[in-house]
């Protein structure tokens, strides 16, 4: 039982470890930040972290390259100044917008209407990244451009060195991103269901193994029904087959139905904790209901006579004897064998006498004349 509990705990630990590793591996596939590659007029680059919005189009796989323009007004809560007209057809422009004063979707929609291809919204008095969302379905349907969110320090660096007026340009680089609330929660639900099923399966298997082990072991009340004999010198058995120690006077021997005897201290743990069979001949000490039924069926099959039934049947197995009846059975067997020998001797004597009479008759017939011999033979026939 302790071994089964240990195996159950080990299996549960392994399952927990596997699920934990898979969960962390899955979380590693959920980056919360993308990258902004900024290049100044000297082609020096710098990378800034950003967080894509939950509305609008995704960034293209190859990234979005454009020139950065400061929004006018900065909060973009109303229509803003469009990008330069002379370069509008040949270049892509990205607008930098300040947070607060209105919703994110309004800011991005105003940037889209002004002609910008992407929008960057920066935080105020903080470098924390916020996931931009919207509750207005009508506004969401109108937004087509991508947008990202950055911290205030990143926005100040972009304004100082990487704007369009200072000869800089940006590349918004997308990264593999999965919405956490859409993928992690179903994943955790599936993992939880699998874990519950595994635990139920392991508990069921543990209970079945425990019941099976109980059926294969001997109960205390069944053990008490087996006879116990105190060993005396001259008894039939001399060595315990389990501990290989010779029996001494006064040793308590447990006598099994198969007539094998063992020390009580040796065979009792075997019967109650391992199997209810004889350690030597493997015969069951207390047959179960299924065993008795199978024995009855097999005996009925043996009694049925078919075309495959052998002419000479094998000898039936000798029934189990008690420890005290062994000597009587052996003496009875010796007496039976001696009586069989006497009957065989009598039969041999009778057959030899009959053969002697036949031989004497033949001798008499040969000594008589031919006519008389023929007469006697004819009378005999």
UniProtKB/Swiss-Prot annotation:
Pathway: Protein modification; protein ubiquitination. Residues 1-34 form the signal peptide. Changing residue 260 to A: Complete loss of E3 ligase activity. Residues 65-160 form the PA domain. Residues 35-182 are lumenal. Its EC number is 2.3.2.27. GO terms for molecular function: JUN kinase binding; ubiquitin protein ligase activity; ubiquitin-protein transferase activity; zinc ion binding. SMART domains: RING. Changing residue 88 to A: Loss of glycosylation. GO terms for biological process: organelle localization; positive regulation of JNK cascade; protein autoubiquitination; ubiquitin-dependent protein catabolic process. GO terms for cellular component: cytoplasm; cytosol; endoplasmic reticulum; endoplasmic reticulum membrane; endosome; intracellular membrane-bounded organelle; late endosome membrane; lysosomal membrane. The RING-type zinc finger domain is required for E3 ligase activity and for promoting ER stress-induced JNK activation and apoptosis. It is linked to Developmental and epileptic encephalopathy 73: A form of epileptic encephalopathy, a heterogeneous group of severe early-onset epilepsies characterized by refractory seizures, neurodevelopmental impairment, and poor prognosis. Development is normal prior to seizure onset, after which cognitive and motor delays become apparent. DEE73 is an autosomal dominant form with onset at birth. E3 ubiquitin-protein ligase that regulates cell proliferation. Involved in apoptosis regulation. Mediates ER stress-induced activation of JNK signaling pathway and apoptosis by promoting ERN1 activation and splicing of XBP1 mRNA. Also involved in protein trafficking and localization. This is E3 ubiquitin-protein ligase RNF13. It comes from Homo sapiens (Human). The lineage of its organism: Eukaryota, Metazoa, Chordata, Craniata, Vertebrata. The gene is RNF13.
């Amino acid at each position: 039982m302790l071994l089964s509990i240990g195996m159950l705990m080990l299996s549960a630990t392994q399952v927990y470890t596997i699920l934990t590793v898979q969960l962390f591996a899955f979380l590693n596939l959920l980056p919360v930040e993308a990258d902004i590659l900024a290049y100044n007029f000297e082609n020096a680059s710098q990378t800034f972290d950003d967080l894509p919005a939950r509305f609008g189009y995704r960034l293209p796989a190859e990234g979005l390259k454009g020139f950065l323009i400061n929004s006018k007004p900065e909060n973009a809560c109303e229509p803003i100044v469009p990008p330069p007209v002379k370069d509008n057809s040949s270049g892509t422009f990205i607008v930098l917008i300040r947070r607060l004063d209105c919703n994110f979707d309004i800011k991005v929609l105003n940037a889209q209407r002004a002609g910008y291809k992407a929008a960057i919204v920066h935080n105020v008095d903080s470098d924390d990244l916020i996931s931009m969302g919207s509750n207005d379905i009508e506004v969401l349907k109108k937004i087509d451009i991508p947008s990202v969110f950055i911290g205030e320090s990143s926005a100040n660096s972009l304004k100082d060195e990487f704007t369009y007026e200072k000869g800089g340009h940006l590349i918004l680089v997308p990264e593999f991103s999965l919405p956490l609330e859409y993928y992690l929660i179903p994943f955790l639900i599936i993992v939880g269901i699998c874990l519950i099923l595994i635990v139920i399966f392991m508990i069921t298997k543990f209970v079945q193994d425990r019941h099976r082990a109980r059926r294969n072991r001997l109960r205390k009340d069944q053990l008490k029904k087996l006879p116990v004999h105190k060993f005396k010198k001259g008894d039939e058995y001399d060595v315990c087959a389990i501990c290989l120690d010779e029996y001494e006077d006064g040793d308590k021997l447990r006598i099994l139905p198969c007539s094998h005897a063992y020390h009580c201290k040796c065979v009792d743990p075997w019967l109650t904790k391992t199997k209810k069979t004889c350690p030597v001949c493997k015969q069951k000490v207390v047959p179960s209901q299924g065993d008795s039924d199978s024995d009855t069926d097999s005996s009925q099959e043996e009694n049925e006579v078919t075309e495959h039934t052998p002419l000479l049947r094998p000898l039936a197995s000798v029934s189990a004897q008690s420890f005290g009846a062994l000597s009587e059975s052996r003496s009875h067997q010796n007496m039976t064998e001696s009586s069989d020998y006497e009957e065989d001797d009598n039969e041999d004597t009778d057959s030899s006498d009959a053969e002697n009479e036949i031989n004497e008759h033949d001798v008499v017939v040969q000594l008589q004349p031919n006519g008389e011999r023929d007469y006697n033979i004819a009378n005999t026939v």
